[in-house]
């Protein structure tokens, strides 16, 4: 039962692993991603480029929907994804160091 005056929470239709032209394996411009998300009704994305959070930070500035800043960090033992980041975490560090740096930013550790 919905109480009068209590707003119903909005539903999110999300894609939680998107790459942009900032990633080594993608050349899709940010504007094209925004356009496609609108077509599909997606209102939340996590931009997780390889080795950088810059694409996610830029997308967060221009997108008309929720953008989670993420990054795929190449560690000495494979990739770890950090979500809800504030800045880029460098590649080539140990998994332990990556986890510590993600948590230091208040982020969520995700093993893809």
Question: Which ranges hold each PLM region?
Answer:
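A metal-dependent hydrolase metal-coordination microenvironment
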Residues: 2-105
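Active-site-proximal loop/helix segments of hydrolase catalytic cores
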Residues: 105, 111-112
């Amino acid at each position: 039962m919905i109480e009068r005056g209590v707003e119903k929470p909005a539903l999110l239709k999300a894609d939680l692993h998107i790459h942009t032209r900032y990633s080594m394996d993608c050349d899709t411009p940010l504007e094209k991603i925004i356009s496609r998300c609108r077509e599909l009704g997606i209102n939340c994305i996590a931009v997780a480029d390889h080795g950088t959070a810059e694409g996610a930070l830029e997308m967060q500035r221009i997108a008309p929907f929720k953008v989670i800043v993420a990054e795929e960090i190449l560690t000495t033992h494979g990739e770890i994804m950090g979500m809800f980041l504030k800045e880029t975490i460098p590649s080539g560090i140990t998994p332990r160091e990556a986890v510590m740096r993600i948590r230091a930013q208040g982020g969520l550790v995700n093993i893809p």
